[in-house]
């Protein structure tokens, strides 16, 4: 009996210590693939590019390897709607100001075999922040650049720009502005320029619940006199738009998802090349290589919508709203389809509440002073040293701070065309931002319901100043079942590691080495 007890204790000890640090350079292929899957999962914002693997641990459970990764990232200028591979994003147009936004993501991924193509992302949690103001050096510069946090204030400018584009491109007649992603202002010389990036979506005049989803992305440049106060009438307006074909991002296996299981465009092994933007005969060439929802039963294969508007490719089948209590814990992987566990226990479900990425009104002044648009009541991460947070950003009891919810990413969400029904349940629950960082919702960026537990969250924090470090994302991930795992003495997944691997962090890949100062670990050991 004593021998049996000793054996059981040894087995338990073995599994309790199974999560082990690993070399950051050794897991680089998995980290790159995981970041690609995360980008393809996201609905809003810009593609993350990998700067560095900050930490890496792994756990081997029978034939499955679980990766616990901490990735330092930087936003590119490519919209996530492009579905590009993050390393294929071209450098930004030097004529337009490009905001420098850094971030850190904690990621849990699994691989059942030794093939990297089998990698699945189980969950992720990211924090991002702009460092443009902190890096600005305009002591002798005649040009001042501001990056605004409250982008919703410039929706009128986006609408005006899109209207001009519609006048010259009939195929864009039914498109509307969706989200205002970035707004920059350049002052100096002979005038003032506003540079507005925004996503658009197709909104036909008549409601067709089976209408395919089509999204696009536009960049508008509006120029005014130096002291112009009226932003309604720019002296010059230039806009470039491109549309992304959802058919290119369907299940690459060609197998339609089961009805009732949320299907998402993300999870492809590789991003397909986007088709050229709509360019009707006689229209001007409005594009250059940018870096950058409706619900119902699936339509029959031969069904098409003949409403007014651009000819739309057939996209992923929209879905009927479904009860969260019937959802399964879903993951997404490189086979192009969303994966589901076979555990239907409602306790494994994590209802989320869907919120957009929005911030207080805030502009980044080159001298780190607040322009008139600033909201002085917003909380800042100033003075928060990484060691002042819980290890790896872990919140004590897994609750989020009051008043803040994550942005859950789902292509099957509602946009400006389709306000959610009043009886539509909200099913969003996330991991929470770093403690002490609350953010108020802005106008026009309300909750977007979706069908089921969402994978992954991205939190936009206030801009960093010189000497500050990016707060770490939380790591209170919910439990998930490992595939093909039947061992009764080992939990499904381990808590996210609190220690740092001795073989980490890796080296920075960025062309901006100065951003390294904003991360916890600046130099490799």
UniProtKB/Swiss-Prot annotation:
Keywords in alphabetical order: Angiogenesis, Blood coagulation, Chemotaxis, Cleavage on pair of basic residues, Copper, Disease variant, Disulfide bond, Fibrinolysis, Glycoprotein, Hemostasis, Heparin-binding, Metal-binding, Repeat, Secreted, Signal, Thrombophilia, Zinc
Disulfide bonds: 24-504, 78-89, 105-126, 203-417, 218-241
Record flagged with keyword Repeat: yes
Chain intervals for the UniProt region annotation (Disordered): 252-407
Protein location: Secreted
Recorded disease: Thrombophilia due to histidine-rich glycoprotein deficiency: A hemostatic disorder characterized by a tendency to thrombosis.
Tissue specificity comment: Expressed in macrophages and in malignant cells. Expressed by the liver and secreted in plasma (at protein level).
Cystatin domain boundaries: 19-136, 137-254
Organism listed in the record: Homo sapiens (Human)
Region feature Interaction with ATP5F1A, mapped onto this chain: 41-84
The protein's name in its UniProt record: Histidine-rich glycoprotein
Role of this protein: Plasma glycoprotein that binds a number of ligands such as heme, heparin, heparan sulfate, thrombospondin, plasminogen, and divalent metal ions. Binds heparin and heparin/glycosaminoglycans in a zinc-dependent manner. Binds heparan sulfate on the surface of liver, lung, kidney and heart endothelial cells. Binds to N-sulfated polysaccharide chains on the surface of liver endothelial cells. Inhibits rosette formation.
Domain notes: The His/Pro-rich (HRR) region contains approximately 12 tandem internal repeats of the 5-residue G[H/P][H/P]PH consensus sequence. HRR binds heparan sulfate and possesses antiangiogenic, antibacterial and antifungal properties through binding Candida cells, and preferentially lysing the ergosterol-containing liposomes at low pH. The tandem repeats also bind divalent metal ions and heme. The cystatin domains can also bind heparan sulfate. Binding is enhanced in the presence of zinc ions.
Keyword Plastid: no
Compositional bias (Pro residues): 310-320
Signal peptide range in chain numbering: 1-18
Cofactor: Zn(2+)
